[in-house]
Amino acid sequence: MRILGINISHHSSSCLLKDGEIEWFMEEARLAKDKHHHIEYFNGGFYGSKLLKDIDHIDHVIFTSFCSKWHDWRRIACCLQAITSQGCSFGEVIFDPYEHHLYHAHNAFYASGFDQAIALVMDGSGALYKPMVDIEGGFYRESESVYHCEYPDRILPKERHYSAYEQAAIEPVTEGINTLSNTFPAALIFSRVCESFGFGARGADAGKVMGMYAYGKPDVYKNPWYIKSKTGHWITDNTVMYDDMLPFFDGERDFQKQANIAYKLQEETKKYTMSKLHDIIDKYNPKNIVLSGGYFMNCV
């Protein structure tokens, strides 16, 4: 049995399994000769299909994404067309756009070697909040999630935080295990700082900002970027944060000032992350903790 997994999000990639063994794994950028290539219906599509020219049939094709509200199904159609163009047929097609953080938790847990762990996922832009996906302006996305993981296949969601990224902070609203707020995820703050400096977005250039941290000075930007809400949640003070970044969005390029912002960014997100980890330890007393998502992969 062959299973083809395709990531149609940014930094696209694909992996072909045959009877549970990896036949190949390929990043699209290597085939497209474009460092930041991602699968689109207008830019050459799915380059990984070229590796299928000697394969007659795939039993299951499974897609993952961060849930693009309009474009995912177009990308999927593009990939399927590319597969058949190589003379390869396929059976079941699977795509669940609402479990982006579950995939991150799987990656962290099954690569860890642990038999049990709590997975903390911190991401810039996860799946959309399903109950509001069809509402105009309903752009709440996963930013943080907590899962209980046990071998062989027990992974249960314990907490989900969805963020809307509005300018003004609001009091978080909790619905079961779901919390909705207008706080900025730590990973997205990195992305916003990258953009304000004129770097690439989506965490691609987070390493540059981290390097600038070493040259930054403490206590230049004194107002905290995180505040504690009345509900006890730590949320970003978006007005303060954007006021600090605004000169750079307006084009100011002063290395020392940028380094000072990088210092502020690193310290603020570090303090927040540590508070989140202490909260997990207090609530769940886990034997192990695994970390995943764009923040931990790109920004830490």
Please describe what each predicted stretch is.
Residues 1-300:
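Short acidic/glycine-rich loops and adjacent helix/strand connectors
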